[in-house]
From Swiss-Prot:
It is an enzyme of class 1 (oxidoreductase). It comes from Streptomyces akiyoshiensis. Catalyzes the NADPH-dependent formation of L-aspartate-semialdehyde (L-ASA) by the reductive dephosphorylation of L-aspartyl-4-phosphate. This is Aspartate-semialdehyde dehydrogenase. Pathway: Amino-acid biosynthesis; L-lysine biosynthesis via DAP pathway; (S)-tetrahydrodipicolinate from L-aspartate: step 2/4; Amino-acid biosynthesis; L-methionine biosynthesis via de novo pathway; L-homoserine from L-aspartate: step 2/3; Amino-acid biosynthesis; L-threonine biosynthesis; L-threonine from L-aspartate: step 2/5. NADP(+) binds at T9, G10, Q11, V12, R37, S38, S153, G154, N316. PROSITE patterns: ASD. Phosphate binds at R93, K220. GO terms for molecular function: aspartate-semialdehyde dehydrogenase activity; NAD binding; NADP binding; protein dimerization activity. The keyword Plastid does not apply. It catalyses: L-aspartate 4-semialdehyde + phosphate + NADP(+) = 4-phospho-L-aspartate + NADPH + H(+). Its EC number is 1.2.1.11.
């Protein structure tokens, strides 16, 4: 397969390159693309090309992870030159002619791609889908209440640098925060609205200007869950929270079903679910650098009929972005080979 990566020098693009190698993806030719600023540099012996001016003719699959604006500008052009585009941004997820795919959940959806583009879900949605699919198949999912605990790497390298820098700056005096949240002078926040070190921010993403006071992250969770699980009427209430963790998103999920399902029954279903691993105490540190969605703390939710509560942790850079894109590419490669 002749493969391209747009955004190859970025955080997710770097992980994509690593995962292609780890999974022995059948790459016969690899081309790397990034901004004009990075063009001409070398990565693993491959010269990076300017994504905006490159000719993509001859490529079979192109993975995009360079942000929504780049995907909007280039994805259709690349698809028109013959490649199947797998896009990691939010640019195409809601488009009715673009399938939104989690490899273990709805792989059949890749076949219906009239625009030649397949979208990768948001990282928080991605973590939940392999867990919710078997539960929905068993009991009929009706509603979700979700609180997320999202790592700073979800904001890119700048988020990682901000947490690291703030932590280094104040760690020597951090004990003073025990009794007074203003006892330490934090560096001025840049990426986030408030200091992220030793703190929790109930605002992951940006407020959408539609009067609902939800963030785009919260709306992605609702819209993408409906599309992937093929439940257009699914009710979803999310609160997306940024936490001082470098990598690994976690979700507390309270789910309501149409039919009874016990905690033991759910555990049995999830034991063999693809992309899922049971864990007594799932944590982002456990998930970082790993592929599965780790799920635990499975119990009944007594506030609703047929309710379950559970906790999920997943690496937002691997399965939450790069791994799923490569897994979709594997499905496409198998199809193209016939």
């Amino acid at each position: 397969m002749r493969v391209g990566i747009v955004g190859a020098t970025g955080q997710v693009g770097t992980v994509m390159r690593r995962i292609l190698t780890e999974r022995n993806f059948p790459v016969t030719e690899l081309r790397l693309f990034a901004s004009a600023r990075s063009a001409g540099t070398e990565l693993d012996g491959v010269t990076v090309e300017d994504a905006a001016t490159a000719d993509y003719t001859g490529l079979d699959i192109v993975l995009f992870s360079a942000g929504g604006a780049t995907s909007k500008a280039l994805a259709e052009k690349v698809a028109s030159q013959g490649a199947v585009v797998i896009d990691n941004s939010s640019a195409w997820r809601k488009h009715p002619e673009v399938p939104l795919v989690v490899s273990e959940v709805n792989p059949h959806a890749i076949k219906d791609r009239p625009k030649g583009i397949i979208a990768n879900p948001n990282c928080t949605t991605m973590a939940a889908m392999p867990v919710l699919r078997p539960l929905h198949d068993e009991a009929g999912l009706e509603a979700l209440v979700v609180a997320t605990y999202q790592a700073v790497s979800g904001s890119g390298l700048a988020g990682v640098a901000e947490l690291h820098g703030q932590t280094q700056k104040v760690v020597a005096d951090a004990e003073k925060l025990t009794h007074d949240g203003e006892a330490v002078d934090f560096p001025e926040p840049g990426v986030y609205k408030r200091p992220i070190a030793f703190n929790v921010l109930p605002l992951a993403g940006s407020i959408v200007d539609d009067g609902l006071n939800e963030t785009d992250e919260e709306q992605k969770l609702r819209n993408e869950s409906r599309k992937i699980l093929e439940i257009p009427g699914l009710k979803v209430s999310g609160t997306c929270v940024r936490v001082p963790v470098f990598s690994g998103h976690s979700l507390q999920i309270n789910a309501r079903f149409a039919r009874p399902i016990s905690a033991d029954g759910a555990t049995e279903l999830l034991k063999d679910a693809p992309g899922v691993e049971l864990s007594d105490i799932p944590t982002p540190l456990q998930a970082a650098g790993k592929d599965p969605s780790y799920v635990g703390r499975i119990r009944s939710d007594e506030t609703v009929d047929n309710g379950l509560a559970l906790f999920v942790s997943n690496d937002n850079l691997r399965k939450g972005a790069a791994l799923n894109a490569v897994q979709i590419a594997e499905l496409v490669a198998a199809e193209l080979k016939g």
